[in-house]
Amino acid sequence: MKKKVLVGMSGGVDSSVAAYLLKEQGYEVIGVTMQIWQDDEEFIEKEGGCCSLSAVADARRVANKIGIPFYVMNFKDAFKRNVIDYFVDEYMEGRTPNPCIACNKFIKFSSFLDKAMAMGIDYVATGHYAIIEKHNDRYIIKKSEDDRKDQTYALYNLTQFQLERTLMPCGQYKKSKIREIAKEIGLRVHNKKDSEEICFIPDNDHGRYIKNRFPNKVREGNFVDKQGNILGTHKGIVYYTIGQRKGLGIAFGKPMYVVDINPFRNEVVLGDLEDLLNTELIAKDINYIPFDTLKDPMEVEAKIRYSQTPSKAIITPIEDGRVRVNFHEKQRAITKGQSVVFYKDDLLIGGGIIEK
């Protein structure tokens, strides 16, 4: 009897080819687009986002082409609660969230997987560029064949339960090959542009998005230097993130960067590039993939943002399940709320949220 797999289809080329590859491998494939858009004109009408209405049409067209059933499933409430509300709250607290990591943790590999299990379906699948393997009774995640498209940074939260029930067929290929396969089988999405923006913010202007929804919470405040001297007026702390130089709306005669955000005083602290450089951070909410807990310091390569090349570091377990990360070289703009992710060569060790 064929194993069943529920494929999350965003209307893009990766998830479309993932569905095709799994069908070719002999699975009984069911395509699903997760309805996460809110009752919001700009979100609904937005073209090209990973879960917009136009994406549903693309996904349905692909499903028809490759001959699999297709459904739209409603995850609006879970998405609002776990992704949008978290996103807004983090910015209001002066931190910089990563909504894609939250979506993977709470929606794609939790709510979506729960739905599949309830339907008696064996697996869920996505178009992520990562490789899941089983080694000595434990599931691991390795970097994909395509270094440039590798998405393991956003997958460090996956549990053994989730990995056992997840398929990622695109991880074995380079993006160029995925597009080639899509073209060969006649999928119109073969040359569809990759989605790079936050799916629920059409223009990627998170400050404007939050201000529109909570106009009373976003207040002007002071730009200050490290000594607390007032340098000017900012639009609201939600508009800024650590390391930001452009868009400050004020000229200083030299480059100035956001080096800290104080939500309690509603202040944005500005400083020099040197103020952004650091070798140490503390991370919380740690999840490990190849093992359950870390008892001793470990040499790893770590990165503090998605597009960064990993840097050598030592991770040391400390109290409350947190870790101290000491980099061999200074890192620029270590940002509270973002994730730090650990590797050993191409093996994903785990990661957590940067606390300080």
Swiss-Prot record:
Q: Where are its TM segments located?
A: none
UniProt lists the gene as: mnmA2
The molecular function GO annotations come to: ATP binding; tRNA binding; tRNA-uridine 2-sulfurtransferase activity
Q: Which key words are in the record?
A: ATP-binding, Cytoplasm, Disulfide bond, Nucleotide-binding, RNA-binding, Transferase, tRNA processing, tRNA-binding
Protein name as annotated: tRNA-specific 2-thiouridylase MnmA 2
Organism, scientific name: Clostridium botulinum (strain Okra / Type B1)
Q: Which residues bind ATP?
A: 8-15, 34, 127
Localization per Swiss-Prot or TrEMBL: Cytoplasm
- For this UniProt entry, what is the primary localization, expressed as one broad class? cytoplasm
Q: Extract the ranges annotated as region (Interaction with tRNA).
A: 149-151, 305-306
Q: Which GO terms describe its biological process?
A: tRNA wobble position uridine thiolation
Q: Write one Pfam family the protein is assigned to.
A: tRNA_Me_trans_C
Q: Which SUPFAM superfamilies would you find in this protein's record?
A: Adenine nucleotide alpha hydrolases-like
Recorded catalytic reaction(s): these are: S-sulfanyl-L-cysteinyl-[protein] + uridine(34) in tRNA + AH2 + ATP = 2-thiouridine(34) in tRNA + L-cysteinyl-[protein] + A + AMP + diphosphate + H(+)
Q: Does the keyword Protein transport apply?
A: no
